[in-house]
Structures are given as C-alpha cells and as structure tokens.
C-alpha cells in the first residue's frame, strides 16, 4: 500500500549534525517521501515515495526519480550496497530486489517461500542481506530474523524469540542490531538488542538487550565509524511502528545506549527512520517528519 499525506500535512526532510545542529533541507506537501539512505559519496539522500525511488541532492536541493524497471511499487525498506553503486530494495510484492542507483532493470533476489521479505541490512562485505520474514504476509504473525546471500539461494533463520524487526549489520560485520519483543510479555513493547552475526558455523545467539526502557524503541542504526547510533522512540504502549504520532529520534554513543546525546521530538513514526541514514563520514544523519498544519516543527 502506498502512503499519502493527509490534508494539511507535509513531509520535512531534516539533516542533524552530531554536534547538535539540525537543518530542514526539503519540505513539500506532494509526494510522501520516506526512509532516507545516504549515498557513499555523501552528495545525496535516497528515499522512497509513491512506490518509486528518488534521490535528493544535498547541495542543489533537487529531487529526481530513479528510472527503474522490472520492479513493483516499493516500500520503505531499502539499503545501499557497499560498492556505492547498487541498492537493495523491498517491493510491495514481498520480494527483495537489487538495482543500480542510476536506474535500469532490477533483479529479484528472494524466491516464493510463503513469506514476505522486509529488507534492513547488508553485510559490510556485500555478501549477505538481513531481513524480516513474515509468513504468508500475515502481519498478525511475529517477524523472524533471516539472512540470504545477495546472489539468492538458501535463507538462514536466526533463532530469536518474539516479534523482531530492523536487523542491521554493525560496520565491522560482527553483530546484527535490531528491535525485538523477546524481553517482555507486554504486547508491542519493542526493545533494542543485538546478536552475533551469523556465519558458517552459527546462526546468531541469545539476544543482548542494549538498554531497558519504558518506551517502545525501534530501528537501531550505527554510524559508519561504529561510534554513534540513532534510533526512533515511540510512546510506551505503542504497538508496532505506526505513522502520525509524536516520536523521538535519539542519538546515543554506541557503547552506552542509556545516555542520549540528542533527542529530536517530532510528528512522524513510520517512514521517519526505518533504514540507516548516516552520512559516510559519520557526522550527520537524516530523518523525515510529517507534521500536520497544527504541528510546530521549529522546536525540538
């Protein structure tokens, strides 16, 4: 399903600096853009909107559609390939694809295995993808952490209890970071965790909780240098990661998730920070807000 803006709503693309500044770089009320990635050369953001893929030039502030073929409408799960030229994409048909950032034909990676595949991570060596599998597209079922080679083939399930989402490799490839409901019986109370990245001898391990909080915490993203991390925080009691509610985008040291360095209050949720949005030099990260006409976005 393609998301659209409500009457009186607009989308705002923000760039925050690790030194505390932030800048509204693009705002409009037409296409609902989501989930920024940052290109490897640092010149552009890559977002989805209206089922398509778009680039936003950070200097010129211009948006352009990436001309892709052989792929259905996209959702907001997409990750850049480590080579800087390719991108892995999740389609609304439940499959994962690879395409080039300059456009052209996309290639399907996953097969029809009775699951929807929601991509979130690519290993630093570019060989493996981490995704969430949901059986038969039944969103009442818990999401399972999975990996698959970028060339396709056999998938590897990771044994973590509870609903999981957002698996993303650490920059050194040693860990998978994600959110999970494994630590609580409270419905929807997602918390941040990590497990050792699977290799030929293991398929993960017991999840290590990064912190304990009363909020609902989703989508941990480490900076390329591994020193910092961002995530999105929903109010306590939130089930899933819905759109259009007050949320926080939080910056923390990667070694101490309990000590926020920055907290950005905004109206958003779904689409705000679904994928890794760090600049390649680890100095900035991007996110999207979706304020209504009555929402003040000039203050944190």
Residues covered by each model-derived region:
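Sequence signature of WD/YWTD-type beta-propeller architectures
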Residues: 1-300
């Amino acid at each position: 399903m393609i998301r659209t803006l409500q009457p009186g709503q607009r989308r705002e693309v923000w760039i925050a600096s690790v030194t505390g500044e932030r800048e509204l770089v693009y705002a409009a009320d037409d296409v609902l853009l989501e989930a920024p990635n940052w290109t490897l050369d640092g010149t552009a953001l890559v977002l989805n909107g209206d089922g398509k893929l778009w680039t936003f030039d950070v200097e010129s502030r211009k948006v352009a559609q990436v001309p892709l073929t052989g792929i259905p409408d996209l959702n907001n799960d997409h990750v850049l390939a480590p080579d800087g030229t390719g991108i892995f994409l999740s389609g609304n048909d439940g499959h994962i694809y690879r395409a080039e950032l300059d456009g052209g034909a996309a290639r399907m990676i996953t097969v029809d295995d009775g699951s929807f595949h929601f991509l979130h991570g690519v290993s630093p060596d570019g060989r493996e993808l981490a995704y969430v599998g949901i059986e038969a597209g039944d969103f009442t079922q818990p999401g399972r952490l999975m990996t698959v080679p970028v060339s396709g083939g056999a998938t590897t399930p990771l044994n973590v209890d509870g609903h999981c989402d957002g698996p993303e490799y650490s920059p050194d490839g040693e860990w998978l970071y994600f959110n999970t409901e494994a630590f609580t019986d409270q419905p929807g109370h997602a918390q941040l965790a990590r497990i050792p990245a699977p290799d030929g001898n293991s398929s993960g391990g017991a999840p290590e909780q990064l912190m304990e909080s009363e909020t609902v915490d989703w989508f941990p993203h480490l900076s390329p240098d591994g020193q910092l991390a961002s995530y999105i925080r929903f109010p306590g009691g939130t089930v899933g990661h819905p759109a259009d509610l007050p949320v926080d985008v939080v910056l923390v040291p990667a070694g101490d998730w309990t000590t926020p360095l920055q907290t950005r209050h905004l109206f958003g949720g779904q689409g705000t920070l679904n994928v890794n949005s760090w600049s390649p030099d680890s100095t900035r990260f991007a996110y999207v807000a979706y304020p209504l006409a009555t929402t003040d976005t000039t203050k944190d």
